[in-house]
């Protein structure tokens, strides 16, 4: 079962529809027991870093989604998308007083240039590491982005893909069984759907 984690951040139906092309065993949930029993997890989302972390940190029964996610990322394939990627870091300039999940060391910063913000539209992804999500996808293919902040991991070996928008920034991270994309694979045509298929097929 693939669990899409619902923390009131929107954009859940689009990733659910994309996953349904490859499996029907999907649930959208915030229930801790369901999340803990899942074979794979997806953390999507659009919105504000601080508001989202407050939702994730609220207790649901005996524990918070924050605690549940940090347990699960050690065991099963995990995919963070857009804001879901940024939440995996330790903190963000968008809401400096609110800690992130801390799964990956580093922070989230606002674009430091005069290019139009948000970075919105199609852009190429440079594959800097060979990871399972890239299988069947050529280098420098186009994916769809909508964001004003980007990740800045202190662990540079987790950077698997980069994109240039005024300067080069990380757009795909991979740490063990944790994967994260700044772009929206579910909105990125055939290449994005191939990436989702690759995630579904992970063991």
UniProtKB/Swiss-Prot annotation:
Pathway: Amino-acid biosynthesis; L-histidine biosynthesis; L-histidine from 5-phospho-alpha-D-ribose 1-diphosphate: step 5/9
Coiled-coil positions: none
Annotated Gene Ontology cellular component terms: cytoplasm
Active site location: 82, 184, 186
Reaction(s) catalysed by this chain's protein: 5-[(5-phospho-1-deoxy-D-ribulos-1-ylimino)methylamino]-1-(5-phospho-beta-D-ribosyl)imidazole-4-carboxamide + L-glutamine = D-erythro-1-(imidazol-4-yl)glycerol 3-phosphate + 5-amino-1-(5-phospho-beta-D-ribosyl)imidazole-4-carboxamide + L-glutamate + H(+); L-glutamine + H2O = L-glutamate + NH4(+)
Keywords of this entry: Amino-acid biosynthesis, Cytoplasm, Glutamine amidotransferase, Histidine biosynthesis, Hydrolase, Lyase
Single GO MF annotation: imidazoleglycerol-phosphate synthase activity
InterPro entries, per the entry: Class_I_gatase-like, GATASE, Imidazole-glycPsynth_HisH
Domain Glutamine amidotransferase type-1: 1-203
The protein's Enzyme Commission number: 4.3.2.10, 3.5.1.2
Domain of life according to the entry: Archaea
UniProt subcellular location: Cytoplasm
Classification via Pfam families: GATase
GO process annotations (BP): L-histidine biosynthetic process
Role of this protein: IGPS catalyzes the conversion of PRFAR and glutamine to IGP, AICAR and glutamate. The HisH subunit provides the glutamine amidotransferase activity that produces the ammonia necessary to HisF for the synthesis of IGP and AICAR.
Subunit structure: Heterodimer of HisH and HisF.
NCBIfam families: IMP_synth_hisH (TIGR01855)
HAMAP family: HisH (MF_00278)
Protein name: Imidazole glycerol phosphate synthase subunit HisH 1
Organism, as annotated: Methanococcus maripaludis (strain DSM 14266 / JCM 13030 / NBRC 101832 / S2 / LL)
Protein's gene: hisH1
């Amino acid at each position: 079962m693939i669990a899409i984690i619902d923390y009131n951040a929107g954009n859940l139906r689009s990733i659910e529809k994309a996953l349904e092309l490859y499996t029907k065993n999907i649930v959208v949930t915030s229930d801790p027991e369901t999340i803990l029993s899942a074979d794979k997890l997806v953390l999507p989302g659009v919105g504000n870093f601080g508001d989202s972390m407050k939702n994730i940190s609220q207790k649901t029964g005996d524990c918070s989604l924050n605690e549940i996610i940090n347990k699960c990322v050690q065991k099963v394939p995990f995919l963070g998308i857009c804001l879901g990627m940024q939440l995996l870091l330790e903190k963000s300039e968008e809401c400096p007083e609110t800690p992130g999940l801390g799964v990956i060391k580093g922070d989230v910063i606002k674009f430091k240039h005069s290019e139009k913000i948000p970075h919105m539209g199609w852009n190429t992804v440079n594959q800097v590491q060979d990871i399972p999500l890239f299988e069947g996808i050529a280098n420098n293919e186009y994916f769809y982005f909508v964001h004003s902040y980007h990740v800045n991991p202190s662990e540079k070996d987790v950077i698997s893909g980069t994109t240039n928008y005024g300067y080069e920034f990380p757009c795909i991270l991979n740490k063990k069984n944790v994967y994260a994309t700044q772009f929206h694979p579910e909105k990125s045509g055939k290449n994005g759907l191939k990436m989702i298929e690759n995630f579904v097929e992970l063991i």
